[in-house]
């Protein structure tokens, strides 16, 4: 198949290489022209994926029309808060027979839409059969080195999710299929907020008990909100829910956990973000998740406290105490 990846960050580059090695004709689009030229020349992505060679046959371009035209699949690897602006530049006539696969993990601010909902909102002519997502515990740093990984491809149309499953499957990258596209997206997005909370626990030098509590109660509130929004409960116990939450809360590769850790150690959010090359999706998602919780009248105490720490400058120690001294509940 002819497949383009929009977004040459670590994950976009990793998936481009994986798909190329799987026998597909792959184009990788980078929005900065100078960086696209650098990638083409050096055949490494030293900022976002150092040490990994990009095959010479893999096409790298800054031209969006070239990347989009006459492709079977467009992989959308642009951060969630910037994806709409990229999609807005695409004419439906160029993608009327193309599957759009989102691999971003976030909820759009203001609209409170998942990426699949935003795609349909931005391009009304899109059929739901053309929209899919890929999510799960999958750090680019490991997938690019062929470390065994399992993820989920989801679409409302089973044939679409099956096509993505077949396109991406390798001996080291196992893909399951699902039709619960909403649940897969919500799990992948909301867990980033919980991972910031887990990082705060690390940075504040609390223990394993505290972190385990944040993670398990985090799954509980993610599931509550997801179910209220119409997702399936079993999705949150799977790879895109529990699986992704575990790896994002625990891994040294996790940008969201890193942000939380730095805040727990006393640093300010603006200084942390300024020092990072890559995007920590959970920062902005904490806004959207808090608003969705209010909209659907669902209690999400961890998400609420993470939001207050990030945007209302609440002391992490005070936030932890407030969580621990809430009214008694049954599990």
Annotate each predicted stretch with a short phrase.
Residues 82, 93, 118, 122-130, ...:
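Internal alpha-helical scaffold of NAD(P)-dependent oxidoreductase catalytic cores
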């Amino acid at each position: 198949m002819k497949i383009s990846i929009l977004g040459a960050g670590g994950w976009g580059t990793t998936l481009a290489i994986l798909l190329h090695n799987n026998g597909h004709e792959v184009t990788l689009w980078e929005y900065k022209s100078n960086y696209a030229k650098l990638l083409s020349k050096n055949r490494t992505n030293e900022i976002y994926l150092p040490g990994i060679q990009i095959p010479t046959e893999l096409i790298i371009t800054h031209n969006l029309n070239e990347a989009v035209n006459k492709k079977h699949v467009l992989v959308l690897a642009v951060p969630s808060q910037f994806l709409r602006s990229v999609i807005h530049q695409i004419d439906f006539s160029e993608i009327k027979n193309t599957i759009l696969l989102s691999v971003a993990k976030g909820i759009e601010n203001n609209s409170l839409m998942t990426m699949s909902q935003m795609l349909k909102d931005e391009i009304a002519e899109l059929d739901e059969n053309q929209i899919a997502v890929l999510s799960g515990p999958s750090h680019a740093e490991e997938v690019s080195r062929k470390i065994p990984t399992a993820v989920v491809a989801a679409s409302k149309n089973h044939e679409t999710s099956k096509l993505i499953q077949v396109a991406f499957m390798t001996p080291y990258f196992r893909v399951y299929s699902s039709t619960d596209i909403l649940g897969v997206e919500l799990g992948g997005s909301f867990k980033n907020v919980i991972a910031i909370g887990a990082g705060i626990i690390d940075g504040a030098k609390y223990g394993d008990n505290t972190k385990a509590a944040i993670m398990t109660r985090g799954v509980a509130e993610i599931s509550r909100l997801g179910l209220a929004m119409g997702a399936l409960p079993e999705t949150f116990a799977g790879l895109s829910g529990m699986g992704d939450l575990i790896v994002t809360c625990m891994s040294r590769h996790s940008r969201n956990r890193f942000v939380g850790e730095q805040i727990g150690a006393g640093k300010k959010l603006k200084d942390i973000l300024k020092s990072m090359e890559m995007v920590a999706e959970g920062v902005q998602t904490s806004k959207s998740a808090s608003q969705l919780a209010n909209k659907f009248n669902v209690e999400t105490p961890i998400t609420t406290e993470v939001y207050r720490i990030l945007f209302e400058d609440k002391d992490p120690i005070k936030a932890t105490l407030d969580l621990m001294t809430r009214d008694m509940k049954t599990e």
